Amino acid sequence: MSDYKSTLNLPETGFPMRGDLAKREPGMLARWTDDDLYGIIRAAKKGKKTFILHDGPPYANGSIHIGHSVNKILKDIIVKSKGLSGYDSPYVPGWDCHGLPIELKVEQEYGKPGEKFTAAEFRAKCREYAATQVDGQRKDFIRLGVLGDWSHPYLTMDFKTEANIIRALGKIIGNGHLHKGAKPVHWCVDCRSALAEAEVEYYDKTSPSIDVAFQAVDQDALKAKFAVSNVNGPISLVIWTTTPWTLPANRAISIAPDFDYALVQIDGQAVILAKDLVESVMQRIGVTDYTILGTVKGAELELLRFTHPFMGFDVPAILGDHVTLDAGTGAVHTAPGHGPDDYVIGQKYGLETANPVGPDGTYLPGTYPTLDGVNVFKANDIVVALLQEKGALLHVEKMQHSYPCCWRHKTPIIFRATPQWFVSMDQKGLRAQSLKEIKGVQWIPDWGQARIESMVANRPDWCISRQRTWGVPMSLFVHKDTEELHPRTLELMEEVAKRVEVDGIQAWWDLDAKEILGDEADQYVKVPDTLDVWFDSGSTHSSVVDVRPEFAGHAADMYLEGSDQHRGWFMSSLMISTAMKGKAPYRQVLTHGFTVDGQGRKMSKSIGNTVSPQDVMNKLGADILRLWVASTDYTGEMAVSDEILKRAADSYRRIRNTARFLLANLNGFDPAKDMVKPEEMVVLDRWAVGCAKAAQEDILKAYEAYDFHEVVQRLMRFCSVEMGSFYLDIIKDRQYTAKADSVARRSCQTALYHIAEALVRWMAPILSFTADEVWGYLPGEREKYVFTGEWYEGLFGLADSEAMNDAFWDELLKVRGEVNKVIEQARADKKVGGSLEAAVTLYAEPELAAKLTALGDELRFVLLTSGATVADYHDAPADAQQSEVLKGLKVALSKAEGEKCPRCWHYTQDVGKVAEHAEICGRCVSNVAGDGEKRKFA
């Protein structure tokens, strides 16, 4: 028996079946770095229209986590897809490098500034620490396959950036948005200093817990609100607090707009409480006989006035989201000078930020006769006695609770309003202009707009000053007596910025005021405050985007971060850009959700459900992580677990196998010589290229809309359904058995070539490593990297006017599906082994019959059977299977007649008819020794 294997065109490629991504990707990365792939892309895209995605800087502290990976991968997918869409899309990664977390790390290792080190040495250590953190994170980001200018990132601690941050503040001052005010901060009376959040520890402390009645000014108005008239005694709103010493600074009572508040009659008076807390309050104050007279929503009580029990003035009821039903009365004593929530709501309602307490923790003169000069922690008993005397105390008891203490002295601390610098939301119309700018931005998802609008509408002035060591100095001089800014402030800030550009922020602390103020130096002092780190990152549209040469003066098109950044970077950037330039710093803002585990739980080390991106890359490879990110709808929470990543790996295999099939069957194909013109191609091959064209239209639309999960779904449908279960199945016979250089085979290879050229580009933004690998195995002359080109433009399809158009092949797909069902049943019944052992008769209504007949003998190749005939629908025997999908079709199956050809495996009547090739069929003889078979349709 002759061996005809050598006469077959068997698939062959060096492209491996297994991805082995974890092992292969580092080698590819090394090549990308050695070749300067990012630089190659920039050179290729020079002069094209720009798309600038400005990187929100992660904080330079700690290893990257799965959330960082999601963020950087989404950005990379956009940048690469924009490049393929014909844009020059430079990507400059950045890092946020100043601020408290870095200070704390350095303090833990070296001690506080001024202890073992000077402040200057401390800043140098902070700079050093931040640089090592940047290096660690950069390696992991590069490993993800993210392309960017990693050799020249922007750091907020770059001298030039620090200088430009100072210039940004100067511009805001010049536009009239800065003012000085007071804001409550953690204050240690022993240190006589403000404390950062991280310098606060919590210990148990015993304090008096009191319920206090504030009597209504207009009793009749309250009766009307509750629609009651028969009230016995005065009406009061009851607050509960564990800090009686703050009552002299009370300026309002906060209630919740949506809670139900009850008017409760007790002995000789009526009190207002949250309805859900009535029972617990009555138990606490020892009242058993009470009646609820009526209820209203908290919003109904807004701005009604109540009398302070001992300070001699009225205070309003105001609405606040910070009010809870966890404890107390549902009405919160509000002292804007002694608490952050109180301060924020106080700003909203224009309340006085009263601060009757000095830096040593004693009441200032003129506070109240029995309190002046008394330490606040010794004043609680005095205040309780005062309330009792005034008849306003409903209840007092001792209560143990967790209380903030100084980490150095272990003593209780207070909130105390201190002078700070603010960007005003309203003095020059910043709020109104920002709200206007928001409307001109595209928010993705669109609910982001309402979210940030509400935040801007309700936010207080922005406190931008900090009393820290490692930060950009405010670089201001104020008059010793008047505390007014120097009249030449903008000029002086520019002088400071020039020095910082050369020597970094230390230049400010080294500066002797005389150097730039001359004789005026004696009248002015340097402001010691640094800027809030959100000012650093929020001004990068100016300090980075406006000055980097690759951005060529273009503003950012997109900001992309997690949904928590509406109140973070998106907000600070909007405030600063609008205050500086009168416009938003971005055209589009895209937000993604947070990562959760497979059960939807938040990632937590204590639960043990975190997924480490480093582990995923080391086990599965970065492309699997990238595919998971792309295939997840980022607009909501993004679930990740080993099981979910395994599913991503399964999808990856399907795509890789499709790519491998294409490459293996392009063996020996030279597009320059072997390409078949579209009009000479087999119709089914043109249909397949048309499928790729339709898929490309959908995929490009999805990339344009940033719907990456739609890209993945469409890619999977193309690989699995349109190619895998139909076209690639059908062409194997022609591809393997036809004459190597025949039109029948070259037509097929032409289609595979066009499909591969398109597919590799669709993959590139998401499966970057695999696309690069595929690119290296594609035949024909090409650029070195897929990332420098654009979407493939060589696709074409069938015209609707053709008889065998897309609709024709759609119907054929259905027919084949029905035939497959019959074959599967016959296999289950052991009537046939495989589909080539079968011959089918299709009993069809005239319209369908005409289509099937048009394929002639090639119908059997579409159906993957050894025989296929078409007959009249009404001649179908009783055992013919009625199609459920096509009403005018019945299918009958019989065992194929003739012998099995060992070369093509078809059963035919003409095996052995040619003496020289006695073992194979006539078609194979023609393909081996003759002119080769001709195919027109399939």
Curated annotation (Swiss-Prot):
Cofactor comment text: Binds 1 zinc ion per subunit.
The record's section on Pfam families has: Anticodon_1 (PF08264), tRNA-synt_1 (PF00133), zf-FPG_IleRS (PF06827)
Name its GO BP terms in alphabetical order: isoleucyl-tRNA aminoacylation
Domain of life from the UniProt record? Bacteria
Molecular function terms from GO: aminoacyl-tRNA deacylase activity; ATP binding; isoleucine-tRNA ligase activity; tRNA binding; zinc ion binding
Keywords on record? Acetylation, Aminoacyl-tRNA synthetase, ATP-binding, Cytoplasm, Ligase, Metal-binding, Nucleotide-binding, Protein biosynthesis, Zinc
Catalytic activity from the UniProt record = tRNA(Ile) + L-isoleucine + ATP = L-isoleucyl-tRNA(Ile) + AMP + diphosphate
The residues the record assigns to binding L-isoleucyl-5'-AMP are 561
Q: Which residues carry this modification: N6-acetyllysine?
A: 183
What protein name does the entry list? Isoleucine--tRNA ligase
